[in-house]
Amino acid sequence: MLLSLLLMAWLCPSTVLASADWPDNVSIESDAGIIMDANSGAVIYGKNIHATYAPASITKVLTALIVLERCSMDETVTFSQNAVYNVESNSSSAGYDTGDTASVKDCLYALLLKSANEAANALAEHISGTTEEFAVLMNEKAAELGCQDSHFSNPSGLNDENHYVSAYDMALITKAAFENEDFSKIVATTYYELPPNKKNPEGQGISPGNKMIKKNWPDQYRPDVIGGKTGYTSIALNTLVIGAQQGETKFVTVILHSSGTQYSDTKALLNFGFNNFKAVRIADYDKTFSTIGDDLKISGLPTSEKQVLTIDPDSKIILPVTADFSESTVSLDYALPAGAPSGAIACVNYLLGERTVGHAYLTLKDAVSDAGLALPQALLEVQPSALAPAAENPDISHPEDKEPAPGPSARNADGAAQPPESEPSKQDGNKFSISLKIPSLFWKILAVVVVVA
């Protein structure tokens, strides 16, 4: 009986109720900005989110993320002459000189708090040998995170015509960075002691440029801000990325090309987000999907290959405070993005009207050891056609069909190619918002092999 009810719930679309209006009572003065739900990646509000600008030192968020994924904190970094002197004059520095050594940990604090450009170069050389080779890793990581409008040519963010980002891409990078515990700890730090080096034989204390975590800057300080990174060059103007959290609701914000309003714009975005939206745990409301892991197993296989169909109980969606979970609808997407969990067979997308508000993955796990396994052969046989009907759906856009991103000189803030500011834009087009019809062949096979545990 339970099986029948679950399959009916999956196969029969939910009744579409009149959804609550999406709030839009916010504006910013900077040329581009965004507030993104850090749990789901849903865009809450954006202005020119795919226009490209020079990022300045918020580039170091991506540099730090790559370092944290590839290095241990106690590794020793040696500062080369190129690392120390291949920077613009009077740019941010922690005072390291040629031949100095420091731990990866100290370099990261210098990078993210002091915004030390020589630390960015030294870390890049430590990993890749040269800053140019490290830039290759930066672009690969950005693409892995879903970035399509950006290109990186150095680890520090100094001016280069081939170094540019969009607000949306930078939000994806910042969201990923705040998912790293070490990154979150560093950018929340208000004071750190760097060990002695040649120019500072007694060591030095450093503090972040981000005023939103400093109580001695009352006009900018916010207790809900959990960290961030500032940037400035004469071309980029002021840039700022911030993470903030109240309860289970967590946002990241990005401001680009700001003429001094980066903090007031960020505060406006955060006030808008926390006053108008709430994070909702899927498992608290959607009993159809949240109980899959407890109630269903895929059988008809040898005992050693039995699988459990599960969904992450901690997955959240973001909703306006006036909206109810019952107003959301569900679609399944079988074109999984990079970084999908092992054993994932589909992404369950939650939408409010036409807007994606969150997602969770359906995954297959070993029923005994809870280790991820490959899909059962019966499902593999139907995957190529039944589970990936993208070629038959003219509404699905493909990254390979997209024109190359314009550089900073082609800032198309008002161009026709830009989506309306209130729409989630490309995120919905490429990844989550396409409502694919559930392939009947897939469910026929699943209905045969799924039994109540």
Locate predicted features.
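Sec-dependent N-terminal signal peptides of Gram-positive bacterial secreted proteins and lipoproteins
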Residues: 1-19, 443-453
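Active-site-adjacent loops and short helices of periplasmic peptidoglycan-processing enzymes
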Residues: 16-168, 172-181, 185-186
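N-terminal cationic amphipathic segment used for targeting or macromolecule association
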Residues: 7, 14-18, 31, 122, ...
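Generic "edge-of-domain/loop-turn" microfeature
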Residues: 7-8, 12, 40, 84, ...
